[in-house]
């Protein structure tokens, strides 16, 4: 990068799905000697511990959703306050590039940068472009995508699209060095269930009940690791305690989740972009249950990509009930060659160097802008 004292401003919503790829990019940029500042909303404090940024700027934000005119009006007022704060931040920081990772918290910083004629790069993690990124796409210098095909990219923005893949954290890359665990007729079976950085109650409602319905010889071989919300822990632990499992570990959050993915023979999870990217890079088969009710249906699209590749087994939440999950688990654990094939297919879809690809694109964008 040719600009003096280079600085890149990253804008990401305060959930793991947005912060994890931003963190992976920040590490690569820092390795290149580039200063990184993170702009996000108030939720970031709970998840940003150790984020590799020299500064974290809190920008007021809200999502204008729902049918209430008052609620939507209040959300737009908050976004307006965020835009004013973002204008001040962009002027003060004078970044070479502003990179957005989607979600409404990124709208004020990206829109401020575009109005101040600072180059902007959007990263769309999902197989369907989100509404915030769609709104910002026309003014973006470059659009990077996690999937090779992304629905909903504005036609005029398509020529500026570059497929980089979804950046994953160093812990995921380290876990990817672990081969798929061998399966034997009487050996251990490792099942991991989680619902993303914010948890998912449906996992606690369905997975323990499904496991309890498995044949006793299968349960005796089963080692379960499950993420559950704090209010669901006691119920899940009680069901597992009565099920006669080889072992069960239930907790609200696992800091070493990538390592636990690597140890799993099968994963049951939502299909957020970061989860899908991590499963692919590590190379683990999964039963994916897309989050229902989304206007964009992005998780369904993400799951469909892995399903089409033979790397995952998508299940709509309407079909995600204990009886059907138990049947899926029994069938898959009874077909080790099918699980191994899905693991290999998952690894083929992964892009382990996505963070480096995206970092190179950020630098190229800054250089192109500085030479105009």
Swiss-Prot record:
Protein task: Cell wall formation. Catalyzes the transfer of a GlcNAc subunit on undecaprenyl-pyrophosphoryl-MurNAc-pentapeptide (lipid intermediate I) to form undecaprenyl-pyrophosphoryl-MurNAc-(pentapeptide)GlcNAc (lipid intermediate II).
One cellular component term from this protein's GO annotations in UniProt: plasma membrane
Keyword Cell division: yes
Protein name: UDP-N-acetylglucosamine--N-acetylmuramyl-(pentapeptide) pyrophosphoryl-undecaprenol N-acetylglucosamine transferase
Taxonomic lineage of the native organism: Bacteria, Pseudomonadati, Pseudomonadota, Alphaproteobacteria, Hyphomicrobiales
Enzyme Commission code(s) on record: 2.4.1.227
Membrane topology, record value: Peripheral membrane protein
Family: Belongs to the glycosyltransferase 28 family. MurG subfamily.
Organism expressing this protein natively: Methylobacterium sp. (strain 4-46)
